[in-house]
């Protein structure tokens, strides 16, 4: 909205044309989202407390988590509000990729909202059934993949790109839709599984979103894409604005979510943020780089899969508790130590992912 306004005003005063630069709008989107989060956050959290929208804690979880009972949850609605508003303010709304990102994120947030609401209504930690949750996620993910496939103007936009290996494109054709489904649903649920400690999920999300913004900017610029030998995807640069909004909103949320947390994002935020990261990675053709940079999300998910398979086959558990962050808590690690060490690992993985821009 602001972008369109400034472009109109540019005919009156050429100085307004400075807002056509993606890098400037990316920075402004980050700052806008951060300020909005910090300003709205206290009022939003107060409302959650007023209406007793509090976290339900599992009885079989770490004992230290019992004090979290009743902490305001569904804070992800704040993140969603800020991200979407900021994106609409600073993006080129004539770009269909912007709408795919916004609507997919909003849809996954809505699924998470229903899940959180049912937990509150039932006064336990069980929300939507697994079948209902994955069914709804599948509908949205297939729809998003289908739209992106229809929007693709050349084979590169639906081909698998291998990081660190130059000039390798694996055409997927219509299989791109199925591949996108797994990336979106997998990333969404991986972030959700990671969201079990104060600040644990939001910091890696911010780091990965920032890095994906760089990839999106490069892939949307024909000159940079050619120089760095990455796929050129026309229009993908607008995802830099979306990523800037994710970074700003995430940092603003962290202000209230850092240990000891004043609010939790709930499934409303975790499912939406995971889907948002996935959409940007798909648009920028960097799904495998997302797998690297989001290594913490991947390991957390694998720990759950390993735990379930092991228990069903042998009756024994590999970890003291899954996801993995609870295993370390059960070993006696303080919650902040677990979170910060996972953040450090994410810093390393994000740097590895970014290095793929040059190492080819």
Swiss-Prot record:
CDD domains: GT_MraY. It holds the Pfam family Glycos_transf_4. Pathway: Cell wall biogenesis; peptidoglycan biosynthesis. It is found in: Cell inner membrane. It catalyses: UDP-N-acetyl-alpha-D-muramoyl-L-alanyl-gamma-D-glutamyl-meso-2,6-diaminopimeloyl-D-alanyl-D-alanine + di-trans,octa-cis-undecaprenyl phosphate = di-trans,octa-cis-undecaprenyl diphospho-N-acetyl-alpha-D-muramoyl-L-alanyl-D-glutamyl-meso-2,6-diaminopimeloyl-D-alanyl-D-alanine + UMP. Its EC number is 2.7.8.13. The keyword Cell membrane applies. GO terms for cellular component: plasma membrane. Keywords: Cell cycle, Cell division, Cell inner membrane, Cell membrane, Cell shape, Cell wall biogenesis/degradation, Magnesium, Membrane, Metal-binding, Peptidoglycan synthesis, Transferase, Transmembrane, Transmembrane helix. The chain crosses the membrane at residues 26-46, 70-90, 94-114, 136-156, 164-184, 199-219, 236-256, 263-283, 289-309, 339-359. GO terms for molecular function: metal ion binding; phospho-N-acetylmuramoyl-pentapeptide-transferase activity; UDP-N-acetylmuramoyl-L-alanyl-D-glutamyl-meso-2,6-diaminopimelyl-D-alanyl-D-alanine:undecaprenyl-phosphate transferase activity. It is a multi-pass membrane protein. The keyword Repeat does not apply. Its cofactor is Mg(2+). Belongs to the glycosyltransferase 4 family. MraY subfamily. NCBIfam families: mraY. Catalyzes the initial step of the lipid cycle reactions in the biosynthesis of the cell wall peptidoglycan: transfers peptidoglycan precursor phospho-MurNAc-pentapeptide from UDP-MurNAc-pentapeptide onto the lipid carrier undecaprenyl phosphate, yielding undecaprenyl-pyrophosphoryl-MurNAc-pentapeptide, known as lipid I. This is Phospho-N-acetylmuramoyl-pentapeptide-transferase. The gene is mraY.
């Amino acid at each position: 909205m602001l972008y369109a306004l400034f472009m109109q005003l540019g005919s009156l005063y050429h100085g307004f044309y400075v807002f056509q630069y993606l890098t400037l709008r990316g920075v402004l989107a980050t700052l806008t989202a951060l300020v909005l989060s910090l300003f709205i956050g206290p009022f939003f959290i107060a409302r959650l407390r007023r209406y007793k929208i509090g976290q339900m804690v599992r009885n079989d979880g770490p004992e230290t988590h019992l004090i979290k009972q009743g902490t305001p949850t569904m804070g992800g609605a704040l993140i969603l509000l800020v991200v979407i508003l900021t994106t609409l303010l600073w993006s080129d709304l004539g770009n269909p990729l912007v709408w795919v990102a916004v609507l997919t994120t909003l849809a996954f947030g809505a699924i998470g909202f229903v899940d959180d609401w049912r937990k509150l209504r039932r006064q336990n930690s069980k929300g939507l059934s697994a079948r209902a949750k994955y069914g709804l996620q599948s509908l949205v993910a297939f729809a998003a993949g289908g739209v992106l496939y229809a929007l693709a103007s050349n084979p590169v936009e639906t081909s698998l790109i291998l990081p660190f290996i130059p000039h390798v494109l694996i055409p997927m054709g219509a299989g791109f839709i199925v591949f996108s489904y797994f990336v979106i649903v997998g990333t969404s649920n991986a972030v959700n599984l990671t969201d079990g400690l104060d600040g644990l999920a939001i910091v890696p999300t911010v780091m990965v979103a920032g890095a994906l913004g760089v990839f999106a900017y490069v892939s949307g610029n024909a000159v940079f894409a050619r120089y760095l030998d990455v796929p050129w995807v026309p229009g993908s640069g607008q995802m830099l604005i979306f990523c800037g909004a994710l970074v700003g909103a995430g940092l603003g949320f962290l202000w209230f979510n850092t240990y000891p947390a004043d609010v939790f994002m709930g499934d409303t935020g975790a499912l939406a943020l995971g889907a948002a990261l996935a959409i940007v990675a798909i648009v920028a053709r960097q799904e495998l780089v997302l797998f690297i940079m989001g290594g913490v999300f991947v390991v957390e998910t694998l720990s759950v899969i390993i735990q379930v398979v092991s228990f069903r086959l042998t009756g024994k558990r590999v970890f003291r508790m899954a996801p993995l962050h609870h295993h370390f808590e059960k070993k006696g690690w303080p919650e902040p130590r677990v979170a910060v060490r996972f953040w450090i690992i994410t810093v390393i993985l994000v740097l590895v992912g970014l290095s793929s821009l040059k190492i080819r």
